[in-house]
Amino acid sequence: MQGAQEASASEMLPLLLPLLWAGALAQERRFQLEGPESLTVQEGLCVLVPCRLPTTLPASYYGYGYWFLEGADVPVATNDPDEEVQEETRGRFHLLWDPRRKNCSLSIRDARRRDNAAYFFRLKSKWMKYGYTSSKLSVRVMALTHRPNISIPGTLESGHPSNLTCSVPWVCEQGTPPIFSWMSAAPTSLGPRTTQSSVLTITPRPQDHSTNLTCQVTFPGAGVTMERTIQLNVSYAPQKVAISIFQGNSAAFKILQNTSSLPVLEGQALRLLCDADGNPPAHLSWFQGFPALNATPISNTGVLELPQVGSAEEGDFTCRAQHPLGSLQISLSLFVHWKPEGRAGGVLGAVWGASITTLVFLCVCFIFRVKTRRKKAAQPVQNTDDVNPVMVSGSRGHQHQFQTGIVSDHPAEAGPISEDEQELHYAVLHFHKVQPQEPKVTDTEYSEIKIHK
């Protein structure tokens, strides 16, 4: 009889197990999660899935909490030390378990696109005949749209160091610290950093103006990288000043060296254009000559118009580039070439006139010298008795002594000469050496000697 009872019990056990399981399932109680039915988070960031234990749960209830991905048997987070969690969520999903405060929230950090799913919470106890299962909540993971912020205190000035800060204030502190990277052509050095910011010390140069500076932030927990690029606005004094020259309709050419020379034809139109670098732009002005600091410019712009170049424009012109951080200037020397029909023709005529005058003077001297020699060769020896000295006073106060002599070309027995008839005689003139005096009004004196017999 006893054996028959044992046999009947063993045969009925398979039939009783489904009933026992059904009773256990009947003891599973459900509760509603508080808050929205779905949450949105950007990849690389953090999100908190709120969960609150049911108020009907006895204070003496002790068990373990489990968060599950819908359709999965392995939890994504739990406080049960004997339970394994999914590899994909290990270290990123955490159960914030606090039975006293009824807290069963799920913390997700370093969110990834694969985390996009529905989740639910289950509460189980090994000593209780029933458990609790929450309603489902959907988590949507979107692409990261936030970008780093770059802040610059004040103005970047050439040669002066400044601290630039790259920050990501939207990053959660519980996540994996991001990696900051800086890219710039300017001289830089890294400063202090936190989980949400990085400081870069930069000493810009004039050539760094308008160049790019990039801050790149990588989130290693999610494998996402974001960056921001700005253009540097560097203040610097002028480094180069150049003059572009326009002569009439000819093409422009540029002068970069100081005190350069430029030949210009008289009457030609000239346009000088001054250009300088510097940031902010320098104030350009033109001066004639080499100006002092407080000199008055002839043009308050970078353009100097000379519509007709003449003698007044010959000389130096200076362009000055004034800047709060320093000034620079460049000078240009103009040399005026005169037109051939103008001054050049007059000079040529003067040369020809002087040449002709000299030639005529030499011819006169030559003729006078030849005549003088012929007269001396034809003059006979004179009798001293027939020489009569004649004194002539000049207007300059000098006395000249003249000796006259009768020279006969025929014998004495020639026919008599009338008293009234004038005879031609020769005179020998002796000029005493006169000391040179200042030139005065020229007087011409004539002497006529007549001898009557």
From Swiss-Prot:
Residues 148-231, 238-333 form the Ig-like C2-type domain. The chain crosses the membrane at residues 348-368. A motif (SLAM-like motif) lies at residues 444-449. InterPro entries: Ig-like_dom, Ig-like_dom_sf, Ig-like_fold, Ig/MHC_CS, Ig_I-set, Ig_sub, Ig_sub2, Ig_V-set. Residues 27-347 are extracellular. Contains 1 copy of a cytoplasmic motif that is referred to as the immunoreceptor tyrosine-based inhibitor motif (ITIM). This motif is involved in modulation of cellular responses. The phosphorylated ITIM motif can bind the SH2 domain of several SH2-containing phosphatases. Putative adhesion molecule that mediates sialic-acid dependent binding to cells. Binds to alpha-2,6-linked sialic acid. The sialic acid recognition site may be masked by cis interactions with sialic acids on the same cell surface. This is Sialic acid-binding Ig-like lectin 6. It comes from Homo sapiens.
